[in-house]
């Protein structure tokens, strides 16, 4: 059978499997494709297909990630699965594979383990909006009470990280039974129940087009007789000719009007998410705008200097630092299109950060940057990437 033609008339959702090593994330991913393939909603993939995840680069960091796609009657899904724990940390922090929701896989035989906890914390820090739980390997637990105990433990753990532990759907089953097409009452029937829960519980993300206009400034030109043109790729939303917009970040915020939009040397009446455009700005001189600022819908985003972040620091082998760093470390933080120097403050209990660590830290920038929770950045020293991070909370 050739590659299935996916109808793009359904809402699209990005999802992933998270959880402790060997609890069955990859087996579950295979089980979903094998189960949905029966009704033509997927191409069946086995464990080995998914486990041999190709390398990709995101923000200068190499990550192994497997991508599969499938559909339910309600939606089309792109699903990511990572072979190693470090790949999950890097993936979630860089946003290489943006997740609109995740399936937390937890072995019923072991209950929550250290990486179960860490992945839930990461999901909270990087802003994964919703989780659904698959309690796997139920055939290895013959005591119903023990199963209920593990479920309670998972719910308490979710609640402790501010997820709605009491409301999150928990489906109990065996991914292996589904892959091997046996014991449907714990196998494929449970996979269908899981997908129904994912359909219902994980919200459809807002499309980039529906969000407020935002365009990072890449370049600025002065065109004689016409004014100042700012070029860049529209990240989200729509800008129409004649609309008032703001220039935010680095310097005090300025209001201006977009008096023209051009793409490929043609004049348009609007630019939208995904377009590489030149925007003509009224009454702004070439010195009034610089790379690293953003054009946006007025009031939709504000400039900040102090924030909390979750960061991953590259190992020496990944081309990162060879030595640890301490509080008052001063690297560059690369946001969208520019570097800004910032000062790092580590949590009280963290004396130093070693290459390969992921860490929560406070950063104070020397210039304000337009930011929201969830904004990704790279940490650089002299143009070389030494880490990646995501804004988890804005403080000032």
Curated annotation (Swiss-Prot):
The EC number(s) this enzyme carries: 3.6.5.3
Keywords: Cytoplasm, Elongation factor, GTP-binding, Hydrolase, Magnesium, Metal-binding, Nucleotide-binding, Protein biosynthesis
Region of interest (G5), ranges: 174-176
Broadest EC class assigned to this enzyme: hydrolase
Binding site for GTP: 19-26, 81-85, 136-139
Gene3D superfamilies, per database record: P-loop containing nucleotide triphosphate hydrolases (3.40.50.300), Translation factors (2.40.30.10)
Pfam families per the UniProt record, alphabetical: GTP_EFTU, GTP_EFTU_D2, GTP_EFTU_D3
Record bears the keyword Chaperone: no
Single GO MF descriptor: GTP binding
Stretches the record annotates as G4: 136-139
Binding site for Mg(2+): 26
Domain of life: Bacteria
Residues covered by region (G1): 19-26
Residues of the tr-type G domain: 10-206
Subcellular location: Cytoplasm
Region of interest (G3), ranges: 81-84
NCBIfam families: EF-Tu, PRK00049.1, PRK12735.1, PRK12736.1, small_GTP
Subunit composition and interactions: Monomer.
Primary role: GTP hydrolase that promotes the GTP-dependent binding of aminoacyl-tRNA to the A-site of ribosomes during protein biosynthesis.
UniProt cross-references to HAMAP family, sorted A to Z: EF_Tu_B (MF_00118_B)
Name of protein: Elongation factor Tu 1
